[in-house]
């Protein structure tokens, strides 16, 4: 057995300014769920109400299968899928991304806020741009034929890691087989990134950030240069696709900050909020 501090699995740690921190809701840690929503209230947009697919929660090995079941019989070409996720399984994310690309969907980052009213069987919601796309979610974002990232959204990356060593990754022991898994998945990530038309710099930045350090927030300039974001619009505009409507879609000291996994951590620049995160198990 050997000890090492190298990249392996998939998950993230988030560092943000205290005043702008958004505590992650519990729904983001549950397995990813998909649903169809129509913009509302109806009286505010009328016939121009947009439709999108929400994708909220953690990416698991079963997520690609769940998405395929959801997509079956629906016309999703050109439809927007709004991501709100703290990442998860490497292989699950790659399979999900390829399924999204095959369907020709548009990706964005956004939190779906359901409304209480239901009009004609359509579930109404609004799409909030203040949302997170963390860890492997950033690679799913790459899958869109068009990719939109609102200025209020946060896309963050870090190294992949073996999920069963999540409790103390620096003290855990690793075998040669573990190293093989890590190298294999890094290679798959590189191939996928190029396949989706993204810049390999995305993977390079991610691999520089160990999972015990705060996640790396990608700047607007980086999102554009790495082609994580292809649309120039500053606000996510859900698209229901061409000739598609909702009916067709049918100092290192830490202190607890809140119940969402956030902690107050000392740093050279003063106190900052960071959030512990689940790690990927392959």
Regions found by a protein language model. Give the residues of each.
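Cleft-lining beta-strand/loop regions that shape enzyme active-site pockets
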Residues: 32-153, 157-159
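Positively charged n-region of N-terminal signal peptides that target proteins for export
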Residues: 1-4
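Short acidic/polar alpha-helix capping motifs at helix-coil junctions
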Residues: 31-34, 59-62, 169-170, 183-187
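Charged, glycine-interspersed solvent-exposed loop segments at helix/strand-loop junctions
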Residues: 123, 158, 163-248, 252
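Electropositive, surface-exposed helix/loop patches at the edges of structured domains
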Residues: 143-159, 188-201, 271-282
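Short helix/turn-capping signatures at newly exposed starts of structured segments
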Residues: 19-23, 92
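Bacterial N-terminal signal peptides
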Residues: 7-17
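Compositionally biased, proline/threonine/alanine/serine-rich low-complexity intrinsically disordered stretches
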Residues: 23-39, 46-47, 231-282
């Amino acid at each position: 057995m050997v000890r090492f501090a190298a990249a392996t699995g998939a998950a993230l740690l988030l560092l943000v300014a205290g005043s702008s921190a958004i505590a992650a809701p519990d729904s983001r840690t549950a397995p990813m769920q998909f649903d169809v929503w129509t913009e509302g209230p109806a009286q505010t947009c009328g016939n121009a109400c947009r439709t999108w697919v929400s994708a909220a929660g953690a990416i698991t090995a079963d997520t690609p299968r769940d998405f395929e079941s959801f997509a079956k019989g629906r016309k999703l070409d050109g439809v927007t899928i709004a991501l709100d996720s703290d990442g998860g399984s490497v292989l699950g994310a790659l399979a999900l991304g390829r399924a999204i690309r095959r369907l020709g969907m548009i990706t964005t980052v956004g939190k779906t806020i359901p409304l209480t009213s239901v009009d004609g069987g359509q579930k109404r919601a609004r799409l909030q741009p203040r949302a997170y796309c963390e860890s492997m979610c950033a690679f799913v974002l790459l899958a869109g034929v068009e990719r939109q990232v609102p200025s209020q959204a946060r896309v963050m990356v870090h190294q992949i890691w073996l999920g069963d060593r999540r409790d103390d990754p620096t003290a855990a022991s690793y075998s040669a087989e573990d190293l093989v898994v890590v190298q294999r998945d890094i290679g798959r990530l590189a191939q996928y990134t190029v396949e989706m038309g993204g810049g390999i710099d995305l993977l390079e930045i991610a691999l520089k950030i160990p999972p015990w350090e705060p996640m790396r927030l990608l700047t607007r300039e980086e999102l554009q240069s790495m082609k994580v974001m292809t649309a120039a619009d500053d606000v996510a505009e859900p698209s229901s696709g061409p000739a598609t409507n909702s009916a067709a879609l049918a100092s290192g000291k830490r202190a607890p900050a809140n119940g969402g996994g956030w902690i107050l951590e000392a740093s050279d620049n003063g106190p900052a909020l960071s959030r512990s995160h689940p790690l990927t198990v392959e």
